[in-house]
Amino acid sequence: MSAETENRISVEDLFSSKGRVKVLRELATSSELNISELCRRISLNHSSTKSHLQVLINSGLVEEKVFGRIKIYRYRIEDLRARSLKNFFELWHS
């Protein structure tokens, strides 16, 4: 089994949480955000947001970049699944 296949998250798990969908949608429409700004924009607490981010990082949809003590989260638009989800969000909200 390839690393890409191991990182797959089921659609049910991906959309099982409103908070996770909020994180995905916000990152898909923003370039890069730190966790404080992301929490502010989606109105979730730090702990919940961090938990959702970890699932999304493990799935390969989001990337975490570390600059000293600062962590920046980026939507991996180069991933076909991430690109498809971004298109879905854009169509759904148009």
Where would I find each of the regions flagged by the language model?
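Short, hydrophobic-biased segments on the C-terminal half of alpha helices
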Residues: 53-54
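Residues within the helices of the helix-turn-helix
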Residues: 25, 35-36
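Beta-hairpin "wing" of winged helix-turn-helix
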Residues: 58-68, 76
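A short acidic, leucine-rich amphipathic alpha-helix
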Residues: 37-41
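Short capping segments at the starts of secondary-structure elements
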Residues: 30-34
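Conserved segment of winged-helix/HTH DNA-binding domains
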Residues: 29, 71-94
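Key DNA-contact positions within bacterial/archaeal DNA-binding proteins
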Residues: 47
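Short alpha-helical segments that sit at the start of domains
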Residues: 1-22
